[in-house]
A protein has these predicted regions:
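ABC transporter nucleotide-binding domain
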Residues: 63-97
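ABC ATPase nucleotide-binding domains
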Residues: 1-75
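Non-catalytic connector elements of ABC transporters
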Residues: 83, 92-176
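Secondary-structure boundary/capping residues
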Residues: 31-34, 85, 155
């Protein structure tokens, strides 16, 4: 079954409800469904496997959690979900981690698609992975200036000028 943007004209609440309904029907009848969408959240919700295309070529084919947590390149990382990025140069590689030298700091990052020291690279960090004033010491602790705070109901979006990136975004869960 091919479904090409079937929920595009629906309002947000109905669209989300229909996503779950379609997923449950698909699972109960056991047929293969190719679901075409430009809505990344919808793709993550509806799919067992997701293919991300760029210029007609598959960039990554994997399950939703692997696609979101371990994108194979910067295109996939930026296409699926929000990202904060820093450009730098790999200064050290040790196992599955590397150090990336920025113009004003050094970041410890996962060594995804990193081949050698001296290589130019982009570090990506999801807004929900960053913390404001963590309770304990950890890697990659930097000071920044809060530029904007916007309440979104389930979370607060905080824009910070951090390490020369004036558009660094954090999503802070709101407590009950």
């Amino acid at each position: 079954v091919l479904m090409d943007e079937p929920l595009g004209a629906l309002d947000k609440n109905l669209r989300e409800s229909m996503q779950y309904e379609i997923k449950h029907i698909h699972e109960s009848i056991g047929v293969t469904v190719v679901y075409v969408t430009h809505d990344q959240s919808e793709a993550l919700t509806m799919s067992n496997r997701i293919a991300v295309f760029n210029d007609g070529k598959v960039q990554q084919l994997s399950n939703p959690s692997e696609l979101y947590e371990k994108p194979v390149n910067s295109f996939v990382a930026e296409f699926i979900g929000e990202n904060n990025t820093f450009n730098g140069e790999v200064s050290d590689i040790s196992g599955d981690e590397c150090k990336v030298k920025l113009s004003n700091a050094e970041i410890i990052a996962s060594a995804i698609s990193v081949k050698s020291k001296g290589e130019k690279t982009t570090v990506s960090l999801r807004p929900e992975r960053a913390l404001i004033e963590p309770s304990e010491k950890m890697d990659n602790m930097f000071s920044g200036k809060i530029e904007e705070v916007i309440y979104h109901g389930d979370h607060t979006r905080v824009r910070i000028n951090l390490l020369g990136n004036p558009e660094f975004i954090l999503k802070v869960p709101n407590s009950t």
